């Protein structure tokens, strides 16, 4: 079973409509699970200024502690506890064979979830992930808005910080496009590379020439990631 966490502004439908995962999953015998990116519905608060990078479509895979978001924005618990339980109760899955990947904000979510649950996920990969949210504008806004000013709480949702604090993985696969407009300000893959080198975590970091941040990029390399996951899930 492969979990896929989507990025800012997305719902589950972005990857289910544009992700090009079906053929590879069918051939590899994988179940593909794609959660939403935030709570939805009447009464769920969004960004006060209706910005795209906070609130609806931008849950950042944390359990909010700040009001008015704490009641609804519990995306960490949703993707690590509530939804896995629901899936296991209703589908023929093997809980001992799970892996996780994601894009952008979802890449951040996938990597942090995997690092904090190393015994649950056999593989983790990401497309253009936000690897150090504590150090970039998207992450500073989201972590501050959901978790408040406690920077120690932020570190639990920051891939680079988790690695610095001792979290480990057997290996990571990360792709990014060198034409991604968010590369230098928001994504900063060089920080992940440095952290993994220092911690001796095997990292395959691939720079894809000419690709941007879009689903053209994701769909091109999705089957490659799924084959990488399948090899580890079936080992």
Task: Name what the model sees in each region.
Residues 1-235:
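Non-catalytic cap/lid and distal C-terminal segments of serine-dependent acyl enzymes
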């Amino acid at each position: 079973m492969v979990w896929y966490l989507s990025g800012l502004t997305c719902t589950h439908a972005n990857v289910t409509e544009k992700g090009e995962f079906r053929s590879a999953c069918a051939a590899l015998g994988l179940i593909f699970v794609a959660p939403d990116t935030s709570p939805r519905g009447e009464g769920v608060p969004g960004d006060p200024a209706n910005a795209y990078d906070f609130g609806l479509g931008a849950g950042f895979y944390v359990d909010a502690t700040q009001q008015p978001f704490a009641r609804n924005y519990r995306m960490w618990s949703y993707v690590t506890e509530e939804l896995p339980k629901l899936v296991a109760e209703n589908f023929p899955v093997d809980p001992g064979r799970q892996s996780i990947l994601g894009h952008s904000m979802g890449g951040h979510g996938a990597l942090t979830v995997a690092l904090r649950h190393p015994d649950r996920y056999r593989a983790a990969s990401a497309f253009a992930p936000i690897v150090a949210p504590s150090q970039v504008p998207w992450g500073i806004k989201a972590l501050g808005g959901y978790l408040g000013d406690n920077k120690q709480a932020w570190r639990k949702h920051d891939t680079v910080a988790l690695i610095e604090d001792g979290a480990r993985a057997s290996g990571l696969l990360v792709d990014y496009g060198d034409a991604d407009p968010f590369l230098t300000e928001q994504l900063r893959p060089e920080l992940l590379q440095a952290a993994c080198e220092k911690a001796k975590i095997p990292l395959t970091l691939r720079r894809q020439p000419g690709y941007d941040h879009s689903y053209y990029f994701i769909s091109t390399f999705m089957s490659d990631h799924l084959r990488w996951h399948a090899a580890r899930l079936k080992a």
